[in-house]
């Protein structure tokens, strides 16, 4: 099973793609391929951020319940 790419690794690849797309000597086919790869990476990054946002929300909710229970004990 392949190791899951880190957010930072994917972001680095996206930055490389952006640099490639800014190259004036890039031909159309290479540009389209780079653009497609970039869009795929943006989607992966977006999904990763949404996943972490969901995890953070769950943790916050659990902690809020803990705090509410502690306040009620006093």
UniProtKB/Swiss-Prot annotation:
Name used for this protein in its record: Exodeoxyribonuclease 7 small subunit
Organism of this sequence: Clostridium botulinum (strain Eklund 17B / Type B)
Range of residues in the leader sequence: none
Keywords, sorted A to Z: Cytoplasm, Exonuclease, Hydrolase, Nuclease
NCBIfam families: xseB
Keyword hit for Transmembrane: no
GO CC annotation terms, alphabetical: cytosol; exodeoxyribonuclease VII complex
Protein EC: 3.1.11.6
SUPFAM superfamilies assigned: XseB-like (SSF116842)
Protein family: Belongs to the XseB family.
Subunit structure: Heterooligomer composed of large and small subunits.
GO process terms (BP): DNA catabolic process
One Pfam family, short name: Exonuc_VII_S
Transmembrane segments: none
